């Protein structure tokens, strides 16, 4: 919308009314399917270890904590929701605030609304179908198409991301005029992400949503490794009209393997001069107690609303972006 006094909302009132209707529609979608809505904390004593995520940190000083207790604003409700799953809650969803101390712009705000849900006994593909159902209902769009990560690279960059070495990845980056970044980057996954962002994303999801699945095993995060091809993880992302909408996993249930991944993340953080993050022992204990076989997905609601309304920026669908907060 046009420039307004900063006390006023960035989004128009008609857009906020439409946003409210979409939130109601999302809740109805899950109620009709018997999925329980839950609420979990916005703060935790532990946080994500992913080298590409930057959480906000605060400090609690109160009874029993006179020396203070570090707390982190949640980048996603994932860890707490998995603890509920391990406790036997069944299928769950949540609409909540999440926080990331990163960029701000047309498609980013440090505080944003997340839709996250988990389906016991669903594999990755069944959950992808449910995500597709939700997108068609909210966006009135065509059914999505699906491409493996490998197929997407081969189609748009003519390179195999699962076998290419760093020299080949840098050569692909040079064709995109990205040598100034790629030539000094030693982390293979960062090179792959650079190529995906600049060489694949602009070409997918133009007319209909596109699922990209089977990311490299080195990018598994909290997903299982495929039993059919150990080079890839049971992980997917969804793109539509130039926007990343969602990220989903066939969830890892092995506590020991998850701890090893967290520790590996922290080693990568140390190598980059980033602070090592406290590992969530409660999550690991929940996995050890028995997380049911399940798949889960996190979807950016503000971006979904932006697409539904044909808006140009998140500022058009959020009442008060961070510069007006």
From Swiss-Prot:
GO biological process: lysyl-tRNA aminoacylation
Enzyme class: ligase
PROSITE patterns in the cross-refs: AA_TRNA_LIGASE_II (PS50862)
Key words of the record: ATP-binding, Ligase, Nucleotide-binding
Disulphide bond pairs: none
Catalytic activity: D-beta-lysine + L-lysyl-[protein] + ATP = N(6)-((3R)-3,6-diaminohexanoyl)-L-lysyl-[protein] + AMP + diphosphate + H(+)
EC numbers, comma separated: 6.3.2.-
Binding-site residues for substrate, renumbered to this chain: 76-78, 118, 251
Chain positions recorded as ATP binding sites: 100-102, 109, 244-245, 300
Gene Ontology MF annotations: acid-ammonia (or amide) ligase activity; ATP binding; lysine-tRNA ligase activity; tRNA binding
Gene Ontology cellular component terms for the protein in this record: cytosol
Domain of life, per lineage: Bacteria
NCBIfam families in UniProt: genX, PRK09350.1
Quaternary assembly: Homodimer.
Function: With EpmB is involved in the beta-lysylation step of the post-translational modification of translation elongation factor P (EF-P) on 'Lys-34'. Catalyzes the ATP-dependent activation of (R)-beta-lysine produced by EpmB, forming a lysyl-adenylate, from which the beta-lysyl moiety is then transferred to the epsilon-amino group of EF-P 'Lys-34'.
PANTHER family for this protein: ELONGATION FACTOR P--(R)-BETA-LYSINE LIGASE, LYSYL-TRNA SYNTHETASE
Family per similarity comment: Belongs to the class-II aminoacyl-tRNA synthetase family. EpmA subfamily.
Name assigned to this protein: Elongation factor P--(R)-beta-lysine ligase
Gene label: epmA
